[in-house]
């Protein structure tokens, strides 16, 4: 039996492609945090400066500059020394994925009753999840939203 070219191809969902793209760039958790913050800020004002980025992430400007330069070399940012930082199209796609992942994990933690250090816990968890796990967490979040009576039962069960 002859195989068609597509028989040897590996297909993925949108999120799967996003994860592959992320792996292609070999982004460290720290680089993901930078890209996510740049994306958040650029969504609002179109650009960000290194000093502002450093303040938002509570790091030294020199550290922010080094990471911005690496992300620029990877083709995710457009940046010239002492200038503004903007996202390339590829940077926007990955930034959007990273922000959505963050929001999904944060919502999940709230849905299971976490009240303390939600931001810190989200940051600690989000970098270690596969795209499939994020998708399943998102489905659970939507399930709780669609069926609030079940969510209420979960909280009742949690008390025992």
Question: Could you say what each language-model-derived stretch is?
Answer:
Residues 50-82, 89:
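Canonical helix-turn-helix DNA-binding module
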Residues 27-31, 47-48, 63-66, 70, ...:
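Short glycine/proline-centered loop/turn elements that form peptide/ligand docking sites
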Residues 1-26:
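N-terminal leader segment of winged-helix/HTH proteins
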Residues 5-7, 124-160:
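C-terminal regulatory/oligomerization modules of transcriptional regulators
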Residues 18, 22-59:
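N-terminal helix-turn-helix DNA-binding core of bacterial DNA-binding proteins
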Residues 21-23, 57, 89-94, 106-107:
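A ubiquitous short alpha-helical element
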Residues 97-113, 117-124, 128, 132:
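Short, solvent-exposed amphipathic helices
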Residues 83-102:
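Basic, amphipathic "hinge/linker" alpha-helix immediately C-terminal to the N-terminal HTH DNA-binding motif
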């Amino acid at each position: 039996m002859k195989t068609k070219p597509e028989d040897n191809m590996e297909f993925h969902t949108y999120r799967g492609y996003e994860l592959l793209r992320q792996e292609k760039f070999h982004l460290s958790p720290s680089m993901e945090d930078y890209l996510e913050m740049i994306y958040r800020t650029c969504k609002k004002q179109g650009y960000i400066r290194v000093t502002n980025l450093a303040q938002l992430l509570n790091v030294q400007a020199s550290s922010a500059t080094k990471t911005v330069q690496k992300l620029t070399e990877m083709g995710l940012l457009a940046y010239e020394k002492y200038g503004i930082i903007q996202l390339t199209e590829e940077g926007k796609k990955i930034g959007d994925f990273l922000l959505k992942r963050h929001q999904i994990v944060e919502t999940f933690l709230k849905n299971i009753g976490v009240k303390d250090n939600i931001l810190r816990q989200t940051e600690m968890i989000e970098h270690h999840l596969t795209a499939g796990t994020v998708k399943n967490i998102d489905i659970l979040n939507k399930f709780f939203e669609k069926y609030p009576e079940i969510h209420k039962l979960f909280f009742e069960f949690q008390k025992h």
